[in-house]
Amino acid sequence: MKSKRSRTYLVSGLTLALIFVAIILVFRDVLPDIVKDLSTVPFWGVLLLLALGFAYEAMESVLCLVIIHHKKPDCTFIDALRVTFLGVFGNITTLGAGTLPMQSFYLYRRGLDAGSGLGIMASEYVLHKISVLIYATVALLLGGDWLEQSASGLARYLLIGYVIGALIVIALTLLYTWDKVLKLVLMLLGKLPHTPKWDERREKWANSLTELNREAKKVLLVPSIRVKGIAVSLVKLFVLYSIPYAALRLVGCTALNFAQAQLLASLMLLITSALPNVAGVGPMEFAFLLLFAPWADTAIASSALVLYRVATYFFPFLLSVIVFLREEKKSLKGFNAQSA
């Protein structure tokens, strides 16, 4: 138990250290300006950002609870909150590979079979992506003229990113809800090389996709869950998209109003969904600077980015470490009790 806990601390510490080093290397040219800007941020401002960051995770938990209640009505908000933070921990420390297993194992301990757990998490992911697309579409319709007039060169690339992101969301939704799309993907998998190694991979991927499709449909095709899930997700995204605006204001940028910051933030999340990342790092930082730097100098935008990532990445990760260690301790106690 102590060795596992020590390993968890080590992995968590190394993850944060590597990300911190990466931030220093990326922003080394403007680091003195960033430090200066951050030193002017009031303590209440930091608390506000952390509160918004936690509120986003709490709303994610509400979405999770809406879906879980379809399968297990006696699950509570605390259960959903733990599932959410286990997902945060798994995404960062295992580079995404352990996210679903960690969440599904917790749900299994709460009485849900593994298939139902995977279906719940896949459904939550799809509803989130659909909501991201809806929010960005509405924001673009309302603020597209302003974006075209104030940054015509950037708007062209954003439109391309929007189209790519939208296609990915639509394809993902159809994969989980329409058997014909699943059959098409399985047929494409059949085109992979026929060697023992690739045969094993193909079978594993095909089984996983088939199970996810079967379980996700049980949730996503229920109208009440779709409506409630998307409604909660839109509120959740409103909270998330408020953080860049707050961060920019705290470091002195007043060039963007609230609605404009919401538009840019919604496009940022949609575009980054189409880009590969490692432990949730990379595309978000690039997109943040790409979208917000035109209305603030590089140092100001970089300072706001640091605040944004503290609220949406570092703080939730620290909370997720606490949740993971508590759940690991409970699991070990249960295992030892069964062994005795």
Task: Indicate residue ranges for each PLM-predicted region.
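Transmembrane helix-loop-helix hairpins in multi-pass inner-membrane proteins
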Residues: 1-36, 87-198, 277, 281-340
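Alpha-helical transmembrane segments of multi-pass integral membrane proteins
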Residues: 49-56, 87-91, 128, 232-236, ...
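Transmembrane helical segments that form the transport core of multi-pass membrane transport proteins
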Residues: 219-267, 275
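A short amphipathic helical element positioned immediately N-terminal to and/or at the very start
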Residues: 32-38, 208-221
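Hydrophobic alpha-helical transmembrane segments
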Residues: 46-50, 77, 81-82, 118, ...
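Short, membrane-interfacial amphipathic segments enriched in basic
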Residues: 191-212
